[in-house]
Amino acid sequence: MRKFLINISYTVLPVWLFFVGMAVYLWAIDDNSGDLMRLGLIDSGPEYTDSICSHLLPEVYYTGQDDDSLLRLDTCGVLVIGDSFSHGGGVGKQGDYVNYLAHESGRKVVVFTPQDPSLSSPMQIAFDLLNLGRIDSTNVKNLVVEEVERYLVDRHCGFTTKHTSIPRVEKTEETQAATPEKSPSPLLRVKDFLFYHLFGANPILKAQLSRPVFGGVQPDVLYFYNEDVKMGFDVSPKSRQLILDCYRQVIDAARQRGVNLILLVACDKYDILQDYIVDNPYPAKTLNEDLMQWMAPDLDRFVFSKQVLSPYIEQGVKDVYLFNDTHWSPASSQLISAEIIKKLQ
């Protein structure tokens, strides 16, 4: 028996040490990796994130709210509804465009995050709050609705004007017992690493760029979500009409409530850098340009991040978007907030 256990240990011990070593490695790099690196399990090194974070604002200047019934009880200069670009995506809340918006405008800024954001899209949430009387000119002067490009078409096509109440999570024994979502443990990330790398299921794509656009160890390499080249293409006439109808419904609802509406389109990382990809094998993405054409009569309500940030990339400014993340950098957040401030009332 003893001999058998010794023989088995020669096989099991190296595997066990491999898993433990990889778990320790992934635990060590977790805090200095962006969302792309955590998904793709590619380390960008602590120096890169440290250099980006050295330019953050010293604190968070905006407030968060997840209960729509409380919006009526307070007033704010700017209410923001959005996705991860408005909720700490990138390097956290201190680097959000919303934080720069609050700091540099001198307005009270509130970010509304529904208790279950998966129930609705930013435009749907905005319409429901306006249409159901949760907000108007007496408690909200300006409303910023931010949407990331890759989900825009699907979200708009699922838009409805028929909600009679704000969608909420159905309380069941399972939801009541559910614990808050946490970051994957190192061991779970080992499982993901093996699955992605052995079976080719890595959700992160890699492309060679014609010139450096990032700082760090791979300045001319682009990592981006595979969804960036799967969603937002070949918009059918029916989908185009649904997109326009969604925008017009929200614009009309804001106008009726006396709220100044600002629409922010957060460009996909692939879209803004697609022209720099060497021998680009992926299709051209034109949704930003299409939206500008379709919504020409209301263009003054829009802030297109691609239009704001592309000139800086052309001028050679690095890290307009983060190398290790799908979001733009804190420096770009400041540029975006400046454009929004120009449209505030």
Segment roles from a protein language model:
Residues 1-345:
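Extracellular glycan-modifying ectodomains
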